[in-house]
Structures are given as C-alpha cells and as structure tokens.
C-alpha cells in the first residue's frame, strides 16, 4: 500500500530554498541529530521541508504550537502531497475539564469532556497510516507527547480478514465487540456494525467515508467489499482487510485480568499506608472508588477514567514514560518542529502542571499512586525519544541554536522577491493620531492594518476610538475561540473590515498577504511582549506584502528594538542584493482566502453526518454575474438551505463561507433588479 512521496507544486525551489534544501538533506544523511532552519516570514519554509521529505522519502511528524497553525500546515502539506497520507493529530477535546480536588474548599471536580468525533477519526487514521505505510506526514500539536495506547497491544487487537478464510459469524461479532465496536442495526455510524443474515457491515473507526461489507457463506468469508455508508454504493472488492480498534486505549482481555490483579495489590499497599497515617476517610474513599472501577473493568473491559490505570494496562514499570505518538513513528522517521521557539518550551511545560494536579488527587485518596504515571512525556524523555530533528523558526530560541551547535541554515531570500518591511520609529506622544492617519492611507488603497498593544484595556479603548472615527475595526483577544479567531482573520483578508487590533495574538505563522502595515504601540516598553523575538515575529506579519511597513512607536530605542531592527535590516539588505543580482522584481502573494480554513469540520469534504451529503461549497464566481434575477434568487434560496444544513451539523466554517457568498449574491441581485 505504501507509495513514494510525490511532491505536487507549480513552483520550483528558488531564492535561498535550493541551498537550504541541499544543506538540510546533507545534514540528515550525515546523521546530524539536530538542525535549525532560520526562515523569514514568507520565504516558503513549508515548501522547503516538503522538498526534503520528498527527496529523502522518510515518514515525518511535523509539530506545531497550536491547532490554528496545525490546520494551516495540514492544508499546505495536503496540497503538496495529494497522493500520499497526510494526517492530522491534535487533541480531540472540544472542551476538557480534568479531574481535580481543591482541599481548601473540599471540592472534588469530576472529569468532564466533549470529544470532537471528526478529530478522533483523524487521530485513528494517523496511527493507522504510520503502522501501514511509509509515505506519511503527520501534522500534530503538542498532544503528541500525551499518553496513547501501546502500539504493541494495539497491533495485537487488530482483526485481519481475508477472502476464503474460515471463521464463524459469532467469532467475528465477538472480536468486533472486543475492539469496542457496538452493534447498531438502525443508525449505521463510525465505530458501529450491523448484521443482516450472513452479511456484516462494519464502519471502521478511522474512516469517514468508506465502510466494509463482510459476506459469509457456510462459515467462510466469501467476499469483502468497500462501500459508501451513506448511499450504499459499492466502491469495489478487496482480497483482505484489517479492522483496527475503535480506540487507541483498547486492551486484550488477558491483559485486563492481569492488570486488575496488579491494581488490587497496589490498593492493598496504599490502604496500609493511609491507615498507618490515620487517614480513614481517604482510605475508605480510595477503596470504594477503586473497587467500583475494578468491577466495571471486569464486566465491560473498561471503566470511566481507565487512563489512570494505564501503567498496568501497558505493562510499564513505575516512572517509565507513557507510550505516545512517537512510539508509532518508524525508527528512521523525521521530526520537524515548526515555530520551534514556541513549541519547544510548550513540550517542557506540560509535565509539571499535570503532576501537581494528580499529586493532590493521590494524597486525598481519589486515585492510586500509579495514576501519576498517566502523564505527558517529560522533556528529557522527549529528547531521548525524538528522531532526527529540524527546528523551523524565523526567530530560533537558545535551545535550538545550542542543539544545532550554533549552525543555522539561513533562508532569508523569498522566491517572490519580497523584502522585509521598512521599519520606522516614531514618538509615543502622538501615536494614536499618527496611527489613524496611516490607517486612512492604507484603507484608501484597499490594504489592511494590524495593530498590537500592550494591554487588553488599551486594545479596547483604541478599537472604540478608531470606530468613532469611521474606521472598520475588530479586536482580537484571548476569549475568542480558535474557530472564531480563524473567521476573524478570514474576514480581514476578505475586506469585511480593515484594521485588526490585538495584544499577543498576531504573531507566529499567520498568513495574511493583504496586510501592508503593522503598528506596534509602546514598542519601547521592554518585556516579553516587546522582546527581540516578539518584535521580529510581529514585524514579519507585514512581510508578505509588496508595500510592507512596520511602525514602532517608542521614545527611545531599547536593546530589543535595536536587535530586531538590525536583524530586519540585515535580511532586507541580503534580499535586495539577491534581487539586483538576479533581476527579480518583488511580487505580491495571491493566496486564496480559503487556505487558512482548509481544515474545517470536514477537511475539504463537507459532509453532513447522518443527514445526507451537503453539497460542496461552490464559489460565487463569474458565473453568478451573468445570472438573471430569477436564477440569482433561486441560487440564494439554495445556498441558504446549505448554510442552515452546515450550521445544524456544527460545521460553522462552511456555513461562514456560504454566508459570505450569499452577501455577494444579494448585492448582485439588488443590482440586477
């Protein structure tokens, strides 16, 4: 099933890209464990990495600092490798409240979570791809360092079926139940199976659009066919098929029985300790909770909060690292850490917070001490387990530079010839009025502006002031969730408004070619929001536009400002020199606005679950201009139905896209009428 990586792109490597690709590949082939790619904003770092993957033909994991950037990277990699397995692995929780105890108020908070089914399916698809083939790119968030089912147990639980094999129907049903599939003859959905006579239909947990039909005759598998679970249309037959477990945490029965004995032993030891310390309430609480879990495991094969017993279920010793996505990556895999100056510190910070919460639960008798081993990896464990690594950032941190021995692969020259923004420093006293006049210059020529402030209060006041002066402005703050944030960025690019005000949200990786001006208020207030790295990242948001400019408002030039200005000027000089030598004229980027929302709920395939297929979002392009008023009215009515369908299915990004089309069509309808 494994193919070779085939890179699809209308462009060839240019600028600094060929040299960067050559150096990275040489380093990997020479066995270098760590390399750093210092690539400026808009220099095509993702394209460089895609070329390295395609040339070396190695399975790759790309770590991103958050879901927004992971979504953006997933969309880009999917375009580069349409024939290969590009997978997405982020936390599947839409909402997560971990189990916790607050001793001061004697409050126990139960675990509460809302799981996104679509992302769960994509996680299962990612691990399946890593186990089955080599042409895999998995784009992951820091969720990759959290415990996952043991790959050895996961492989043991798989159900292999081949045409002609002798197997009893009841044996298949029993195995499906062990894989945690549920029988549902009415509603056929992911992770279920149905039985009709000698025919068993299975909807694999890792699939979103293909189901398996097993046809038996006299205890023999007569035919295995793949079909569309929605329409029932048979796509074709296969000689063999492997059904993977419904969850990563599935465990064979004999392992559960063994784990239960080990849990009982630990409970007995812990009870002695608690009684010796006169903690009678804690002892009673722990006994009651653990025995309830053991009974549930005995009857059902799992229990609520079974992850707290993961050490026993995976057969690990005390303190050993949990199995994670890294255990599924082949030994010669490649790790790419995007925006490494943010992602690397995140990896280091996950373990301690988790540990502090669980220690309280153990101390007060809510959990056994072994629950402490259900945890994310420690940083040292991550370092020991990580394969050959490429750190990618416009502003690498001290850790990456140290690991790379101070050597960096420079990618400063952009293929488009675009230069780093011109930087001006202006006084603070008149910053708001000066900003207003600059905004008006930009909006007059249909360009966008980003403004970054130091405090939430100032951002709110500035937004209000700009609105009073007739500017179309929005304010981006930490209370806005990921999806809404992506919508706001998309609306800025579409021209629904012209100015976006934020604090620390307008930085890494955000791809907005329409932005020609970045204004940094109070740039001379030294601190983490105005550090050299933060300033370079924020200035970089204007680097995708031909007229890119950054204005730093400050009464003095701080060391951070001086370094950021110096680095930007160094890059700009190198870029100008390259353009002059090669006769390149800088060109703006014409990036499709839908790109940032490529992930969506259905990832390019907008499917309404259980309610029939929603039509793919159609562009309200040139054809709409030629329509008659009656045809336009019909089209508007049709799209309104689609929009409501998407909204009902919680597919808000698709609904928002159709809303924008409706806005354009209504304007055309008014003009035509």
From Swiss-Prot:
UniProt-annotated binding residues for ATP: 39-46
Domain Helicase ATP-binding: 26-183
An individual GO BP term: nucleotide-excision repair
Location of this chain's protein in the cell: Cytoplasm
Family that this chain belongs to: Belongs to the UvrB family.
Gene Ontology MF: a single term: ATP hydrolysis activity
Main location: cytoplasm
Motif segment (Beta-hairpin): 92-115
GO terms under cellular component: cytoplasm; excinuclease repair complex
Assembly and oligomerization: Forms a heterotetramer with UvrA during the search for lesions. Interacts with UvrC in an incision complex.
Protein's job: The UvrABC repair system catalyzes the recognition and processing of DNA lesions. A damage recognition complex composed of 2 UvrA and 2 UvrB subunits scans DNA for abnormalities. Upon binding of the UvrA(2)B(2) complex to a putative damaged site, the DNA wraps around one UvrB monomer. DNA wrap is dependent on ATP binding by UvrB and probably causes local melting of the DNA helix, facilitating insertion of UvrB beta-hairpin between the DNA strands. Then UvrB probes one DNA strand for the presence of a lesion.
Keywords: ATP-binding, Cytoplasm, DNA damage, DNA excision, DNA repair, Excision nuclease, Helicase, Hydrolase, Nucleotide-binding, SOS response
Comment text on domains: The beta-hairpin motif is involved in DNA binding.
Designated name of the protein: UvrABC system protein B
UVR domain residues: 633-668
Higher taxonomy: Bacteria, Pseudomonadati, Pseudomonadota, Gammaproteobacteria, Enterobacterales
Organism: Klebsiella pneumoniae subsp. pneumoniae (strain ATCC 700721 / MGH 78578)
Cited InterPro entries: Helicase/UvrB_N (IPR006935), Helicase_ATP-bd (IPR014001), Helicase_C-like (IPR001650), P-loop_NTPase (IPR027417), UVR_dom (IPR001943), UVR_dom_sf (IPR036876), UvrB (IPR004807), UvrB_inter (IPR041471)
Residue span(s) of domain Helicase C-terminal: 431-597
């Amino acid at each position: 099933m494994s193919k070779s990586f085939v890179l699809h792109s209308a462009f060839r490597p240019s600028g600094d890209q060929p040299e960067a690709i050559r150096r990275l590949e040489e380093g990997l082939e020479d066995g270098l464990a760590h390399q750093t790619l210092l690539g400026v904003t808009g220099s095509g770092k993702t394209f460089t990495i895609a070329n390295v993957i395609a040339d070396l033909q190695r399975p790759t994991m790309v770590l991103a600092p958050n879901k927004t950037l992971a979504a953006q990277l997933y969309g880009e990699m999917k375009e580069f490798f349409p024939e290969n397995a590009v997978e997405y692995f982020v936390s599947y929780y839409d909402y997560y409240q971990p189990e916790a105890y607050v001793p001061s108020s004697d409050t126990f908070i139960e675990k509460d979570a809302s799981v996104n089914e679509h992302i769960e399916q994509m996680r299962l698809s990612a691990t399946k791809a890593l186990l089955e083939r080599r042409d895999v790119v998995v784009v992951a968030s820091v969720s990759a360092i959290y415990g996952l089912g043991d790959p050895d147990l996961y492989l043991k639980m798989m159900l292999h079926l081949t045409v002609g094999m002798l197997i009893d129907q009841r044996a298949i049903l029993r195995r499906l139940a062990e894989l945690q599939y549920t029988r549902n003859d009415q509603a056929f959905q992911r992770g279920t199976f149905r039985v009709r006579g000698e025919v068993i239909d299975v909807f694999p947990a890792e699939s979103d659009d293909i189901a398996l039909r097993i046809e038996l005759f006299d205890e023999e598998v007569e035919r295995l066919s793949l079909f569309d679970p929605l329409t029932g249309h048979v796509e074709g037959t296969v000689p063999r098929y492997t059904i993977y477990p419904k969850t990563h945490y599935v465990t064979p029965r004999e392992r559960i029985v063994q784990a239960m004995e080990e849990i009982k032993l630990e409970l007995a030891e812990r009870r002695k300790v608690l009684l010796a310390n006169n903690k009678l309430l804690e002892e009673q609480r722990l006994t009651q909770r653990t025995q309830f879990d053991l009974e549930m495991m005995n009857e059902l094969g799992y229990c609520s909060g079974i992850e707290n017993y993961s050490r026993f279920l995976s057969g690990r010793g005390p303190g050993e690292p949990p199995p994670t996505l890294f255990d599924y990556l082949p030994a010669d895999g490649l790790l790419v850490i995007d925006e490494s100056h943010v992602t690397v510190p995140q990896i280091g910070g996950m373990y301690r917070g988790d540990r502090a919460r669980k220690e309280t639960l153990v101390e007060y008798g809510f959990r056994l001490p072994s629950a402490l081993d259900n945890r994310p990896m420690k940083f040292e464990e991550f370092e020991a387990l990580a394969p050959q690594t490429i750190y990618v950032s416009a502003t690498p941190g001290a850790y990456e530079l140290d690991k790379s021995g101070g050597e960096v692969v420079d990618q400063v020259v952009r293929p488009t010839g675009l230069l780093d923004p011109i930087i001006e420093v202006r006084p603070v006293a008149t910053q708001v009025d000066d900003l207003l006049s600059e905004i008006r210059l930009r909006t007059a020529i249909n360009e966008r502006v980003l403004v970054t402030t130091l405090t939430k209060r100032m951002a709110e006041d500035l937004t209000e002031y700009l609105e009073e002066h007739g500017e179309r402005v929005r304010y981006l703050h930490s209370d806005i969730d990921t999806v809404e944030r992506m919508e706001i960025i998309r609306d800025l690019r579409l021209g629904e408004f012209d100015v976006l005000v934020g604090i620390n949200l307008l930085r890494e990786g955000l791809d907005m070619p329409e932005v020609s001006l970045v204004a940094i208020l109070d740039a001379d207030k030294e601190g983490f929001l105005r550090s050299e790295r933060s300033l370079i990242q924020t200035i970089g948001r204007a680097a995708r536009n031909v007229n890119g400019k950054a204005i730093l408002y400050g009464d003095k030039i701080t060391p951070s400002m001086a370094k950021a200005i110096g680095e930007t000027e160094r890059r700009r000089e190198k870029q100008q020199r390259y353009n002059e030598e090669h006769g390149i004229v800088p060109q703006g980027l014409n990036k499709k606005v839908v790109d940032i929302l490529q992930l969506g709920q259905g990832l390019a395939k907008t499917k309404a679950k259980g309610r029939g297929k929603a039509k793919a979002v159609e562009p309200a392009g040139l054809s709409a201009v030629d329509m008659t008023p009656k045809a336009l009215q019909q089209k508007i009515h049709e799209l309104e139905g689609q929009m409501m369908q998407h909204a009902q299915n919680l597919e808000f990004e698709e609904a928002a896209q159709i809303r924008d089309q409706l806005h354009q069509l209504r304007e055309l309808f008014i003009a035509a009428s």
